Amino acid sequence: MRHARHARRQRGFTLIEIMVVVIIIGLLAAVVVPQFLGRVDDARVAKARQDIQAMETALTLFKLDNFRFPTTEQGLQALVQKPADPAIRNWRSGGYLKRLNKDPWGNDYQYVSPGAQGEFDLSSLGADGQPGGEGPDADIGNWTLGE
């Protein structure tokens, strides 16, 4: 009888053991998941900063060739396709960028020339897609890259 009871206990986990494991997994998830989500936001902000720096370089090359930045109306598209109005005489064959990417949150980058912060303002509106905000919702602009 003693041997039979011992063999039966060896066959599987008790409900209590399974509940303890589920609770431990839940506690670990409660600690790890928020830290992981914060890292995703940090990575998106870093990607937006890199995109803005690359577009800033392309805009500078555009100005070196054409003695001015694209107008607000021409926008960033002037870095990919030759603008027709006003005509650009020294537009680089192949353009200044291969394509325009959206920001890491799926929104268009904002471009204004002349800008309120400098010769041009180039920015992402952040996670919320609205001007202003804090944390991942904060705007990321070419004027904030040094921060």
Residue ranges and their predicted role:
Residues L59-R99:
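Short, glycine/small-hydrophobic-rich surface segments
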Residues V22, R49, E56:
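Conserved catalytic core of two-component sensor histidine kinases
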Residues M1-F13:
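N-terminal leader/signal peptides at the extreme start of proteins
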Residues R2-H3, D42-V45, T57-T60, N66, ...:
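Short, surface-exposed interaction loops/tails
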Residues I16-Q35:
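Alpha-helical hydrophobic helix detector
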Residues A30, G38, D42, L64:
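Short, conserved catalytic or interaction motifs in soluble domains
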Residues Q35-Q53:
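Aliphatic-rich helix starts adjacent to a transmembrane/signal segment
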